Amino acid sequence: MMETPAESVRARVSSVTFYNVTQTAGRWWAIWVVGIVPIKREDVETLIVVQACQPPLGGSLEPPVVNAPSTTELNFLRWERELRRSGGLIAMLADAAEKDLFDLSFRTRDRRLLSAARVEDEQGLIFQPLFPAQVVCQSCSGDDGRDQQPPPVDGFGSEMEGEQTCPHAQRHSESPGQLDVYIRTPRGDVFTYSTETPDDPSPVPFRDILRPVTYEVDLVSSDGATGRGGDARRHRVSLKILEPAGGFESWLVNSWSMAGGGLYAFLRSIYASCYANHRGTKPIFYLLDPELCPGGSDFQPYVPGFPFLPIHYVGRARPAFWHRAPHSEGLLLLDLNLGVSGTPLADALLGLDARSGQRRGSLLLQQIWPPTRKEINPRHVCTREGGEGGGEDETTVVGRAEATAILEADATWWLYELARCHLSARGAPVGTPDGGGQARDAQTWLRALHRYGTSDTRRALGGLYTAVTRVLLHAAADLGLTWAYADEFILGFVAPTSAHPSEEPLAQAFLQGVKDSEDASRLDRDVMGGEATVARRHIRVKARRGPGCLLMAIFQGDLYVGGCREHSGPFLVWHEAFSWTLDQLAARPEADKAPPSHDHLLTLVRDLTRRLAPGRRRNRFWALPRAWLQRLRRAGLRLSGSHVCLLDKDGARPAPCQTATEHGLSPTAYFREIMAFLLDVISALHPGYTIPMEITRETDLLMTVLSLF
């Protein structure tokens, strides 16, 4: 018996992708390709991980002809993700956080991983991710796929070989009529590819960006020894993989490469060129597009196998935890109706250590308020307005409170730190405020835990939210403040008209009350141990003088607050118009006595037009807010994170996140929503009110003018 040379390297894990399963020596073997970036190097290298497994459903998978995975194939991909969590080397690497370092030992001959140990002391090493390669795909007959119609709202697609395919499976059944690809690496290398027939069997010159490497991997022996008489050769499998060439570890693609099907056609051409003469096991190849999900998805595409690197698109928002390699790759499975939501696999995909079983805080309160709570204090609610028979989302709730001062407390970061510790998150799902982290990223992670997590996770998160809310309520009550509204992780309080506090001392007194709270200290100690009080300093508090009247409204599932006078210039997004409208109504001296006058409404409508006009040429400006999208998705709209949703004369429809506004966009539809909101609010404050006909005619004229540009 002869020892096979082995090497060692210290590196971080950039990706974990599945090659396939194969059968040899009477057993089934699962094979993964692990991308690593050794310290002080700027190229991705690959290692092979092999693990014995139970026979998978359907055996090994052959690459599909179209990007339309069947139910069996999708369940196979879920089975593979569950297998990663079963233990062994692959579980450790698949759970790696973005900045984790490992000491890895592998066989020189076939680069099969032999051992892995997490490095606890990083000795001051600075983590530096590799930049992605920028990929632009222009495809489809017409204008980059712009002629494609939105998918119909239906159930499963057509039958393929007796099996159901996932929703919208036929979207890429036809190849684009033309394909142009442009790729630029971080080192400045440029790759271009153009063809009028993407299915052309001629080889694609891809080796400048993806370097093919073939290994003869011994599946049975992992101790570095070779067998006698060539027995080991019978247990070897030929694997052909692609390694990134050019100093990148992922692709960042434009949204049209997904919508037009060009990216899949390009990768399929590479696959055909690479494996045409390969006699060994071929890798799986799926590009799981968010638009394959029944309601679309905000998550990134999932590429479980070939081409062995993460692919992200330029979307309307990319919270940091979506990109935490490698465990976050596969979040799309949560929206594919595979039964993943609510399982330990969902917790793992969201960055939780589902196997730890060690959660502090056994004395947490039971959930009273859900983290997604949007509510106006019933004491301040005037009335509810809305269409007959409409659901909760179609009902407008209007509230009014007397206030000489308004205080708003944002507990996002405190709740995030509590959840991260209590739920045993692997690493930091998002960056901290001190490190440049964004509150919206933390909010997105918390919402995802509430929506997709296991019942234990949701229950624990609800208990933490309830405990945090109680601390804030008690701190406010000690200052004579009453709560006015709750907008998820933000609570608003008002000071009565009998009080005359100044803004800065009020905010400082509130923060001091939270800091001195025994309940808060007990919560921090119980959940975070020695990290007590660290997170509470990130509570954001804003206090301001009130105009004497605070107006609040829940419209289309979103909560808007007026009376804060924060909208003095052009709108950044169109739906700022709702809060601005409340500001204008609250600022009137006669707000509590009489409805707005004709002149006041006319001025309001004209000012509204001036604030909307600067953004009329940007799709992002006209994008519908998140709460509206949830309702539309329940009604059957499919929307991916690479698109926004716009209103045209026929209703809501997806549109790409691009600079120029779609020609079909209808400012009239947006004005109609704003005017409906205005009427609901005034009718709640002054029952029986109707908008004068002159205002309606003026509004129609202004909408017509705005539509011309």
UniProtKB/Swiss-Prot annotation:
It is found in: Host nucleus. Associates with the primase and the helicase to form the helicase-primase complex. Interacts with the origin-binding protein. Interacts with the polymerase catalytic subunit. Keywords: Early protein, Host nucleus. Component of the helicase/primase complex. Unwinds the DNA at the replication forks and generates single-stranded DNA for both leading and lagging strand synthesis. The primase synthesizes short RNA primers on the lagging strand that the polymerase presumably elongates using dNTPs. The primase-associated factor has no known catalytic activity in the complex and may serve to facilitate the formation of the replisome by directly interacting with the origin-binding protein and the polymerase. One of its GO terms (biological process) is viral genome replication. GO terms for cellular component: host cell nucleus. InterPro entries: HSV_HEPA (IPR004996). The lineage of its organism: Viruses, Duplodnaviria, Heunggongvirae, Peploviricota, Herviviricetes. Pfam families: Herpes_HEPA. This is DNA helicase/primase complex-associated protein. Its main location: host cell. It comes from Epstein-Barr virus (strain B95-8) (HHV-4). Residues 141-176 are annotated as: Disordered. Belongs to the herpesviridae HEPA family.
